[in-house]
UniProtKB/Swiss-Prot annotation:
Its EC number is 6.1.1.11. Homodimer. The tRNA molecule binds across the dimer. Keywords: Aminoacyl-tRNA synthetase, ATP-binding, Cytoplasm, Ligase, Nucleotide-binding, Protein biosynthesis. It comes from Prochlorococcus marinus (strain MIT 9301). This is Serine--tRNA ligase. GO terms for cellular component: cytoplasm. Catalyzes the attachment of serine to tRNA(Ser). Is also able to aminoacylate tRNA(Sec) with serine, to form the misacylated tRNA L-seryl-tRNA(Sec), which will be further converted into selenocysteinyl-tRNA(Sec). L-serine binds at T233, A234, E235, E287, S385. It is found in: Cytoplasm. Coiled coil: none annotated. Disulfide bonds: none annotated. InterPro entries: aa-tRNA-synt_IIb, aa-tRNA-synth_II, aa-tRNA-synth_II/BPL/LPL, Ser-tRNA-ligase_type_1, Ser-tRNA-synth_1_N, SerRS_1_N_sf, SerRS_core, tRNA-bd_arm. ATP binds at R264, R265, E266, E351, I352, S353, S354.
Length: 425
């Protein structure tokens, strides 16, 4: 959430920064609301101060007078009651204004970083580097063709169970998924992350804190009778884990890793990636998450990205690192580095991790602070996939395919999977 004080005092600055996302954001109405809200705050404080003075005066009059029913005392009590009624009325107006302001401000995205490349969409994203040698040759099979031939997963029967864009992993497919999850968790915990296993169901306050609500409600699955949603990413419960807390600065940075199933409606992706493991309604992911001192979040962003990269390097999967332009940034992100893995069947790189620095945007929405330099300060949050499991499996199947139809398992994964190759039964 953006700072309401900044919106109130410098609306032009806010509009100019948001416009870097390639859209026009008119905040004049929000500005008016925040100004009214501040005026009411001042009026309430003034009346409360006068009310305290009056209460003290009433006490003095009672102490001096033998008559507790004097005209002077009754007039003072009447005045005190008028103050209470007026304060109550203003507080009700304040509550209504608070909701109006929140409804508006919660729909404003984060400011893009001044270091992010300026652009309108993904075509303006900036490639920083590549790693590994992309596999380019004829007769490359797609991962879903390989999976079918090796009986690793079934999409058709999953449609019978649920609907399209779900998958059932079978035998070695399930085994490979489990091996990847354990491998990634072990790698990250050895690198200083504390493992959490959060709930898969989250409430609206949690989704609002991380930035999914209210703007993206149509992209998540909601339970019919409860204020609970299927979590679209572990970023949501990990943000909420410290909601409404004042964190000891000595504990910063806090680094979490969490495996979780993720659920997304993919409402805006009809017709895209209809085959395979790339875009499903349910998928598994290992998530990295940092809470850190604001002065150290730029370095933390490099580190969380490097930690995600280390998985791709260990698995010997060719990838590239991309700096996301201002027009393609996620709602809560100020700057994002994407890791895109090479998929030889489509002859292109595909996103497998987004590592984002959200600055104080999520912490402000979730009221997560720390006493830094003797002042309660909103801390910075960062998140990144480390990695998306299904897409990692797809990359292993395609990059490791052999001429005999088998798939070579990356050396680092062999102790977890139990063999060097995936073969037909």
């Amino acid at each position: 959430m953006l700072d309401q004080k900044l919106i109130r005092e410098n609306p032009t600055f806010v509009e100019e920064n948001l416009s870097l996302r390639g859209k026009v954001y008119k905040i004049s109405h929000i500005h008016e609301l925040t100004v009214k809200k501040k005026e009411i705050d001042i009026e309430i404080s003034s009346l409360q101060s006068e009310s305290k003075k009056l209460s003290k005066l009433i006490g003095q009059v009672i102490g001096k007078s033998q008559n507790n029913n004097s005209k002077e005392l009754n007039d003072l009590k009447k005045k005190g009651n008028e103050y209470r009624i007026k304060i109550s009325e203003l507080e009700e107006k304040q509550r209504i204004l608070d909701k109006e302001v929140d409804d508006e401000v919660y729909n404003l995205p984060n400011f893009p970083s001044k270091d992010a490349p300026i652009g309108k969409d993904e075509s303006d994203n900036l490639q920083i580097k590549t790693w590994g040698d992309p596999l380019i040759k004829e007769n490359i099979k797609s991962h879903w063709e390989i999976g079918e031939s090796l009986n690793l997963f079934d999409f058709v029967k999953s449609t019978k169970i649920s609907k399209s864009r779900f998958v059932t992993l079978i035998g070695n497919g399930a085994r490979l998924e489990r091996a990847l999850i354990n491998f990634m968790l072990d790698m990250h915990t050895k690198n200083g992350y504390l493992e959490l296993m959060p709930p898969a169901l989250v409430n609206s306050e949690s989704l609002t804190g991380s930035g999914q609500l209210p703007k993206f409600s149509n992209e998540s699955f909601k339970c019919f009778n409860d204020d609970l949603w299927l979590s679209p990413t572990a970023e949501v419960p990990l943000t909420a884990f410290h909601r409404n807390e004042l964190i000891d600065p000595k504990k910063l940075p806090i680094k979490y890793v969490a495996y979780s199933p993720c659920f997304r409606r993919e409402a805006g992706s009809y017709g895209r990636d209809t085959k395979g493991l790339i875009r499903l309604h349910q998928f598994n992911k290992v998530e990295l998450y940092w809470f850190c001192d604001p002065s150290k979040s730029l370095e933390a962003h490099k580190k969380i990205t490097s930690d995600a990269e280390s998985i791709l390097k260990k698995l010997n999967l060719p990838y590239r690192l991309v700096d996301i332009c201002t027009g393609d940034l996620g709602f809560s992100s100020s700057r994002t580095f994407d890791l895109e893995v090479w998929l030889p069947s489509s002859k292109c790189y595909r996103e497998i991790s987004s590592c984002s620095n959200c600055l104080d945007f999520q912490a402000r929405r979730s009221s997560i602070r720390s006493k830094i330099d003797k002042k309660n300060t909103y801390i910075h949050t960062l998140n990144g996939s480390g990695l998306a499991i299904g897409r990692t499996m797809a990359a292993i199947l395609e990059n490791g395919q052999q001429t005999d139809g088998s798939v070579k398992i990356p050396d680092a994964l062999v102790p977890y999977f139990g063999s060097n190759f995936l073969k037909t039964a």
